[in-house]
Amino acid sequence: MKTSERAAGGSAAWPPAADWGERLVRGLLWLFSFLPLWLLHGIGSLTGRLIALIPNRQRRNALINLALCYPYTSDAELIRLRNRALREFGKTYLEIAPLWLRAPAQALALIREVRGAELLRQDDGRGLIVLSPHLGAWELAGLHLAAQGPTAIFYKPQKYLDDLIVGARRRSGATLAPITARGIRSLVLSLERGEAVGILPDQGPRGDKGAVFAPLFGRPAWTMVLVSRLARRSGARVIFMFAERLARARGFRIHCLPAPQDIDSADDLEAATALNLGIEHCVAVCPEQYLWTYRRFRDRPAGTPKVYTGGLSDRAALATAARLRSLAAASSE
């Protein structure tokens, strides 16, 4: 148990927005899509610096996450890493504009290198499950995967900008499978045909089914078990892939990594632990580019305290993380 704190091809469709806020976001995305990458990253980095200066929940949550995941790192280094992560956070959301709104070929031209490309080959006729964490430019990772051949993307419909996101992903040639029983059946069929399936593995599943608490950086994280079940049912291989953002807006480097052993285990905890270990291996390459602002530990084992609480200052965030670490250590004795 746990407790919890559209059109393919052509240009993106722009139906009337639900409110002026969404209209403004759409307009900014359209404007940003024309800007060069160096300017987008410059604006994004500046935005991240501003977020780091003003006490806010994003800043606090990122520091709590880092302090929980890197318990032996000094407070000063955690704050430095958090500030770097916020600058990368800003770049992530500025570069989404051209990735969504430019032609896929233009976005793919930003890829400078692919490491581990042999893992993407499907010479044996088996399906391929590609896990892309919220690391670097995950939208570009999805575009690269779709460019390799028939691809289905496991997709959570969004409250805002959903048609824009759907249209961008479909223009890449991918099909979208919603997070429903029907969507899961669609993924199974794709894998049985020897196609690729893309999944964001570090989203906290909703509800009490289809997930277990498994260690992520040594902390219990509510983790999906869908990947192991898909792999066992279809016989598909599993790998990890992400797009690292290169310095000075030089483009991106794709990394393909083998999945840890046991990721297809029939034991849900073993499989989820292996999945989270694979995420850790990816994050180790460029930890500042992980989405540390995401409330990954929002869902908690019953009887344990909430994570994202307390004051917004750095001192308060570090104190919250220290208290949680102390409680976890005491409960394990």
Predicted regions and their residues:
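Non-catalytic C-terminal accessory region of glycerolipid acyltransferases
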Residues: 2-6, 10-16, 54, 80-83, ...
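Short capping/connector residues at structural and topological boundaries
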Residues: 105, 113-116, 140, 166, ...
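Short, flexible loop segments at the rims of nucleotide/cofactor-binding pockets, characterized by
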Residues: 105-112, 156, 173-179, 216-218
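Short Gly/charged-rich anion-binding patches and loops
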Residues: 27, 61, 140, 164, ...
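A generic secondary-structure micro-motif detector
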Residues: 18, 52, 131, 155-156, ...
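Catalytic core of membrane glycerolipid acyltransferases/transacylases, capturing the structured
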Residues: 124-181, 193, 206-212
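Membrane-anchoring hydrophobic helices of lipid-metabolizing enzymes
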Residues: 2-132, 137, 162-167, 171-173, ...
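Active-site metal-coordination segments of metallo-dependent hydrolases
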Residues: 60, 156-159, 220-224
